[in-house]
């Protein structure tokens, strides 16, 4: 992707300044610095931001080497990287992404949860039954503790 440059804002600048565009980002603090994450939220507002994980098949697995198609992915404390050092994708879980946005970036928890729930539902066109806790909506949710760890998952109103 083109970078943001002061003389040529490119795709990034267009996404940040076009009010009709939602912006998706991976808040693993590897793909984007916490100050850039804050800049995105300030530029777009909570209604146009979507938290994604882009998690690879190596998510939740031990450190080591894994395959992604025909490429080798090395998982370390520094994320999932290709042999040349480039990021291969993310190994972050959504609860950690939410935690990073709140604890590291400093965004209000209510705004962060909207970016992880209702906003994606709107983009997918399912906001009439997903994305919030309300009468008539599917009761799909994760119950988090005060450190934003998943304690329980509820799907269609049933505890898993």
Named regions from a protein language model:
Residues 1-5:
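Phosphate/pyrophosphate-binding betaalpha-module
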Residues 6, 10-29, 36-137, 141-144:
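His/Asp/Glu-enriched, well-ordered alpha-helical/loop segment
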């Amino acid at each position: 992707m083109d970078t943001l440059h002061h003389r040529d804002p490119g795709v990034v600048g267009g996404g940040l300044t076009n009010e009709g565009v939602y912006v998706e980002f991976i808040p693993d603090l590897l793909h984007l610095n916490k100050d850039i994450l804050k800049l995105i939220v300030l530029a777009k507002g909570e209604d146009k931001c979507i938290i994604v994980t882009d998690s690879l098949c190596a998510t939740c697995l031990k450190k080591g080497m894994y395959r992604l198609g025909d490429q080798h992915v090395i998982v370390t404390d520094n994320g999932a990287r290709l042999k040349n050092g480039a990021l291969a994708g993310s190994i972050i879980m959504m609860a950690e992404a939410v935690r990073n946005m709140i604890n590291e970036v400093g965004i209000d928890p209510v705004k962060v949860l909207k970016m992880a729930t209702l906003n994606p539902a709107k983009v997918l066109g399912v906001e009439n039954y997903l994305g919030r806790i309300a009468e008539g909506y599917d009761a799909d949710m994760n119950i988090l503790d005060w450190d934003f760890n998943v304690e329980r998952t509820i799907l269609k109103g049933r505890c898993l």
